[in-house]
Curated annotation (Swiss-Prot):
Species the sequence originates in: Dehalococcoides mccartyi (strain ATCC BAA-2100 / JCM 16839 / KCTC 5957 / BAV1)
Protein's gene: rpoB
CDD domains per the UniProt record, alphabetical: RNA_pol_B_RPB2
UniProt name for this protein: DNA-directed RNA polymerase subunit beta
Cited HAMAP family: RNApol_bact_RpoB (MF_01321)
Single GO cellular component term: DNA-directed RNA polymerase complex
Biological process, per Gene Ontology: DNA-templated transcription
Lineage of the species this protein comes from: Bacteria, Bacillati, Chloroflexota, Dehalococcoidia, Dehalococcoidales
Length: 1273
């Protein structure tokens, strides 16, 4: 191996060279921690809060009964996760609440009693819920935080900026304050008509004008504008508390007679009673911070106070006068996240409120002597509220399990939609846009492309959620001053000298030793200025706190002790980008990938991709199908291991030990302490999307295992790294026009070697029920089915495991009794005694759907006789899993990680593909036109670096914004060229990958007169490039020994252009056409790219129908593959048929192929008998039209007699006015077919028919002339 190779990873044995320049200061946190912690909070605190809220429940009068809840516990789940998925059950735990009943009339306290409160769905260790057998994820909701918001809007009349304020509680009535251009501040209570703010102040106890003016005299001091006085003058009739209360009451309760006591009670309840008004912990925290109230600590008082309202009005005046800044409602300091625990808590609260209401009603009517807690409490509202949330909420989603990355992303997703959130239609541009406060908190790249763009986001890699629901991101603390007794001073450089009484204790620029620290620490407490340095101390900050600091970028240059190397540092301060000296810097980013989500962090060279394409790349990685032979990327970013670790699909050793047993089903590790760790492997498990999870051990029996080592991989991981696609040799060139419009040319080798083969599993189910007509039976004895169709069924009529099945094959045989009437009790008894004669049964077997095939991999049978818990009237339940091995085919969608996607247009034979000078055919041909306009150059850099890694036999990690630069890539290509020239690369077919012989390459370079060791040493950037160019120019007959740097590159470029041969550092090769053997005109970019096969497979899309189901009303074929529907033939397609004059085709399309019921039946019959298809009849849609016209009150009738087109001679005779007698017409025009064959009618005769029609005469067989004057016309 070449000396530049790093050592293999101890845990996995994988050689991966990292090009990261920056150290990893903070490890990537647990990526699903948000879900897990939130649900634990719900179990431990959220539920306790709810129970304390409703306890105790008293009857309406308050003197009969009192029900107290004094604690709760979760018991053990009834079924395991595995059993729940197999039996379509919900993974849940029973909740029991300890209740104590007090009879007020007698003072009796009954014994505490455990009340069953229903089964609560339980979160699995992977952050998901299993409901009805399917895994679901509760997505976190991003919505405006409770609190007070001051915004500015220009007055339309005067253009003056005026303050508008919203006070949003967690629960209760909104207060909206507005300023008018006449300086009146008014308030709307819960969206009602506005009143001057002075009226509200009087109602809450500030009744006198002087009292109100005194509250604001310090603030409302603008000589031109007097807001409070203007508001008082606005309503001169209201001068005291009672008139103010009555005024507000009459607006809030317009129908009720106003009364001062009722009004006071209403206002107290509305704003000052915690039962009805709750700012919430978050709201109180935000209000205190925004209003800078002295009671800074968030206490228990979460209702509003009079002081809060006064402080809000003071702030409104300050904002109007320009003394305070308005709020940005899209700032992440003003938007919070409701995680799963809070969402479940809110739903649970709804159920408990209903439960409380029912309990209070029962308390009033129940017998006091016989009463028990269970008689008062009805748990149904709680159970149904929770069930409704997990089953029907917009935020409880069917988990995206296409691959491990899709799972993680689903769990880290943030949605601005859902109950209480935004809707697609109402959301404007501002709320969807990237905001500066998203930095390090929400990924600016990953969001859907459709109508949800910007409304659904993804948490950034290092972000976390604090106790108030705000997103925090970590920063490293920068110190430029420390206290003189701080031990961190030891080893630091002083910025200014330290002296005492004129004596210098330590000079500026000197390093503080242990001895000098002892002297300094004895001085009186003071700050010591040191050279600014970045500490290892990490602080997590929410967005509003971060705005107060100046923060340096993660790639700021530091020395090994953490001192800044530059005098001017690029940094951020709120939304400004600044350049500041080091002593002004407060914090520093922890990592360049801190900005991005997991999916975006998996894109190498992300910094070279356009944001739109990066978005597509991040989203398409989630759609990649796990392949049969998982292969980790040649060029990775280093996040692959973290993504695989937290997906839960890779098994890591908990403790060190020795593998005592390794099978395909389980791994047993004997630990050093003598215990045994057992790990069960998942085998061919179907995901929600029909892909396959199949874990397999990657260790051997007897192997020593370290703690944290990878024991087993899954379908989309290799050696503990995410492996979503395949490393392919790609060429960027056009080839026979097959890569037009981003189409992809694929080599047959990839099909033959199953490179892009994936496994897809479908699940089919059948129930045998008790019907009204008798019992359904699962059996092999099916009427009118031949032995050929039954050959794979066992004696019970169930398919055997391993059988290969195709469309319409029977999976489970079942017969259902036929019959029109239900049997009476007597008939049932007689049948039971005397046995049954051969009953009429119909075949209702479970069959493979149209177009599906595969191999049966598992069958499960649940039976009432075996004691299985089945739904009512179900006796037997059979589940069959069928797996398909799908090879890649024309029409499948492939993609890279840079948003470069396309559909396979041709799978060409290996011998026809373009091939390299050493005879290696390329695997994939991509269109070069797809690169410049898309501006995703990351794919080219990946191709080049991948090629160097491929030839030299190592894999690469290049983290986002901290990876390999141009020089590094050129050096890597140069080294691979030098190794190839030295014959040091082993390309033998028995090696899975090429490998390079270090010594051979170094020796050869030495012979050429250069230092081989230096060339393969990373500490000499640019040397390998220079040497390779000199040697290449020498081969080309040019002496370049005296050239270097830009001159050398220029010379190489000129020679390359003239000779049409690529230099070693451009990553191009001369390719030959596999069909002709001739070289292509220009050198072609060839390299190694990681390619994914997406779940949009052609086999799921292509569909054909001969006959099938029809719509009930229109009688036209249904649409869509799922309904086994037909192809829509719309208005525009009809126009196309007109244009080509294809009358008969058009007629068929609109009649027998669509909704002519009789015609299509006859057509089918004719085809079966081999006869000509007769002419069509009247389409059903015509009848629907007639009915619709009749419903409008138009007397439309269909003349139902059949009309025959007369021969041309007859028509001419009619045109001349020779009308036959009525009996002649009857005799001549017999009721034959509706339409005669018109082929033998000449153009003239057709015109004659039209003329006849123009004369308002219709020849019909009902013995009368229909003239213009006739009623019926």
């Amino acid at each position: 191996m070449v000396s530049m190779l790093p050592k293999a990873d101890a845990a996995t044995g994988v050689i991966r060279k990292s090009y990261a320049q920056l150290p990893e200061v903070v490890n990537v946190p647990n990526l699903i921690e948000m879900q897990l912690q939130s649900f634990v909070w719900f179990q431990e605190e959220g539920l306790r809060e709810l129970i304390e809220e409703i306890s105790p429940i008293k009857d309406f009068v308050g003197n009969r009964l009192e029900l107290e809840f004094i604690g709760y516990e979760f018991r053990e789940p009834r079924l395991s996760e595995y059993e729940c998925t197999q039996r379509d059950q919900t993974y849940s735990v029973p909740l029991y609440v300890k209740a104590r009943l007090i009879v007020k009339t007698t003072g009796e306290i009954k014994e505490p009693f455990d009340l069953f409160f229903g089964d609560i769905p339980l979160m699995t260790a992977l952050g998901t819920f299993i409901t009805s057998g399917t895994e679901r994820v509760v997505v976190s909701q991003l919505l405006r935080s409770p609190g007070v918001y001051f915004t500015i809007s220009d007055d339309p009349a005067t253009g003056r900026p005026l303050c508008h304020t919203n006070l949003i509680p967690s629960r209760g009535a909104w207060l909206e304050f507005e300023t008018s251009n006449r300086d009146v501040i008014s308030v709307k209570i819960d969206g009602r008509r506005k009143i001057p703010v002075s009226t509200l102040l009087r109602a809450i106890g500030y009744s006198d004008d002087l009292d109100i003016l005194n509250l604001f005299e310090v603030i409302d001091n603008d000589p031109e504008r007097h807001y409070i006085q203007s508001s008082i003058d606005r309503d001169p009739l209201i001068k005291d508390e009672i008139s103010a209360l009555i005024d507000i009451y009459s607006r809030l309760r317009p129908g009720d007679p106003p009364n001062a006591d009722n009004a006071r009670k209403l206002i107290n309840e509305m704003f000052f009673d915690p039962q009805h008004y709750d700012l919430g912990k978050v709201g109180r925290y935000k209000v205190n911070r925004r209003l800078e109230l002295p009671s800074r600590e968030v206490g228990e008082n979460r209702a509003l106070t009079r002081e809060d309202i006064v402080a809000i009005i003071q702030r409104i005046i300050m904002v109007n006068n320009g003394q305070d800044t308005p709020d940005d409602i899209d700032h992440l300091g003003n938007r919070r996240i409701r995680t799963v625990g809070e969402l479940v808590q809110n739903q649970f609260r709804i159920g408990l409120v209903r439960l409380e209401r029912v309990a209070r009603e029962r308390m009033s009517i129940v017998n006091l002597e016989m009463v028990t807690p269970s008689a008062l409490v009805n748990i149904r509202p709680v159970v149904s509220a929770v069930k409704e949330f997990f089953g029907g909420s917009q935020l409880s989603q069917f988990m995206d399990q296409t691959n491990p990355l899709a799972e993680i992303t689903n769990k880290r997703r943030l949605s601005a939609m859902g109950p209480g959130g935004l809707s697609r239609e109402r959301a404007g541009f501002d709320v969807r846009d990237v905001h500066y406060s998203h930095y390090g908190r929400i990924c600016p790249i990953e969001t859907p492309e459709g109508p949800n763009i910007g409304l659904i986001g993804s948490l950034a890699t290092y972000s976390r959620i604090n106790r108030y629901g705000f997103v925090e991101t970590p920063y490293r603390k920068v110190y430029s001053k420390l206290k003189n007794n701080d031990k961190k001073l030891v080893g630091l450089k002083l910025k200014t000298e330290i002296s005492e009484k004129g004596k210098v204790l330590a000079a500026a620029g000197s390093t503080i030793s242990e001895d000098s620290f002892k002297i300094i620490s004895k001085l009186p407490e003071c700050d010591i200025s040191v050279m600014p340095f970045v500490s290892a101390e990490v602080k997590y900050m929410p967005a509003d706190e971060e705005d107060r600091y100046i923060i340096a970028q993660a790639n700021t240059r530091l020395d090994e002790k953490g001192y800044f190397l530059d005098d001017r540092i690029e940094a951020r301060s709120a939304e400004r980008y600044v350049v500041e000296p080091p002593d002004k810097i407060d914090y520093m980013d922890v990592s360049p990938k801190q900005i991005f989500s997991v999916a975006a962090s998996l894109i190498p060279f992300l910094e070279h991709d356009d944001a739109n394409r990066a978005l597509m790349g991040a989203n398409m990685q989630r759609q990649a199908v796990p392949l049969l032979r998982a292969e980790a990327p040649m060029v990775a970013t280093g996040m692959e291991r973290e993504a695989a670790r937290y997906s839960g699909q890779v098994i890591f050793a908990k403790h060190a030990g020795v593998a005592s047993s390794v099978t395909s089903e389980k791994i047993i590790i004997r630990t050093a302490e003598g215990g045994h760790d057992e790990y069960l492997l998942k085998k061919f498990v179907r995901t929600n999307q029909g892909t396959c999870i199949n874990q397999h051990a990657i260790i051997n029996k007897g192997q020593k295992i370290a703690a944290g080592q990878v024991l087993a991989d899954s379908s989309a991981t290799e050696n503990g790294e995410l492996a979503l696609g395949q490393n392919c040799v790609v060429a960027f060139m056009s080839w026979q026009g097959f890569n037009y419009e981003d189409a992809i040319i694929l080599s047959e080798r990839l099909v033959r070697e199953d490179a892009f083969t994936s496994i897809h599993i479908t699940k089919h189910e059948l129930e045998a029920r008790d019907t009204k007509l008798g019992v359904e039976e699962i059996t092999r004895d099916i009427p009118n089915v031949g032995e050929e169709s039954l050959r794979e069924l066992d004696e019970d009529g169930i398919i055997r495991i391993g059988a290969e099945v195709g469309p319409d094959d029977i999976l489970v045989g079942k017969i259902t009794p036929k019959g029109e009437t239900e049997l009476s009790a007597e008939e049932k008894l007689l049948r039971a005694i005397f046995g049954e004669k051969a009953r009429e049964v119909k075949d209702t077997s479970l069959r493979m759907p149209h177009g599906e095939w595969g191999k049966v991999i598992n069958v499960r049978i649940f039976s009432r006789d075996s004691g299985d818990d089945l739904p009512a009237r179900v006796n037997k339940w059979v589940q069959v899993w069928v797996a398909q091995k799908r090879k890649v085919s024309v029409g499948d969608k492939l993609a890279g990680r840079h948003g470069n996607k396309g559909v396979i247009s041709i799978i060409a034979p290996v011998e026809d593909m373009p091939y390299l000078p050493d005879g290696t055919p390329v695997d994939v041909v991509l269109n070069p036109i797809g690169v410049p306009s898309r501006m995703n150059l990351g794919q080219i850099l990946e191709t080049h670096l991948g090629w160097a890694g491929h030839l030299l036999g190592f894999r690469v990690a290049t983290p986002v914004f901290d990876g390999a630069d141009d020089t590094v890539i050129e050096d890597a290509l140069a080294r691979s060229w030098l190794s190839a020239k030295a014959g040091a690369i082993d390309m033998s077919p028995e090696n899975k990958r090429p490998s390079a012989d270090a010594h051979k390459a170094i020796e050869w370079i030495k012979q050429q007169g250069f230092d081989g060791k230096k060339i393969f040493d990373e500490k000499h950037p640019g040397l390998a490039k220079e040497v390779s160019l000199k040697l290449w120019l020498k081969d080309m007959g040019v002496d370049a020994s005296a050239l270097s740097g830009a001159e050398l590159e220029k010379k190489a470029y000129d020679v390359s252009s003239q000779s049409r041969l690529p230099s070693p550092i451009v990553g191009k090769s001369v390719l030959r056409d596999g069909r002709t053997g001739e070289t292509f005109d220009q050198p072609v970019t060839v390299g190694n790219m990681y390619i994914l096969k997406l779940i949009h497979l052609v086999e799921d899309k292509v569909h054909a129908r001969a006959t099938g189901p029809y719509s009930l009303i229109s009688q036209q074929p249904l649409g869509g593959k799922a309904q086994f529907g037909g192809q829509r033939f719309g208005e525009m397609e009809v126009w196309a048929m007109y244009a080509y004059g294809t009358a008969h085709n058009l007629q068929e399309m609109l009649t027998i192929k669509s909704d002519d019921i009789a015609g299509r039946a006859k057509a089918y019959e004719s085809i079966v008998k081999g006869e000509d298809v007769l002419q069509p009849g009247v389409p059903e849609s015509f009848k629907v039209l007639v009915k619709e016209l009749q419903s409008l009150g138009l007397a439309v009738e269909v003349i139902n007699e059949e009309v025959k087109i007369a021969p041309s001679e007859k028509v001419s005779s009619l045109n001349e006015g020779n009308l036959p007698a009525s009996d002649e017409i009857s005799a001549e025009i017999l009721p034959e077919t509706l339409y005669a064959n018109t082929e033998d009618i000449s153009e003239d005769s057709m015109m004659s028919v039209i003329d006849a029609d123009d004369q308002d005469l219709v020849v019909s067989s009902n013995d009368e002339e229909v003239s213009e004057n006739d009623e019926r016309s």
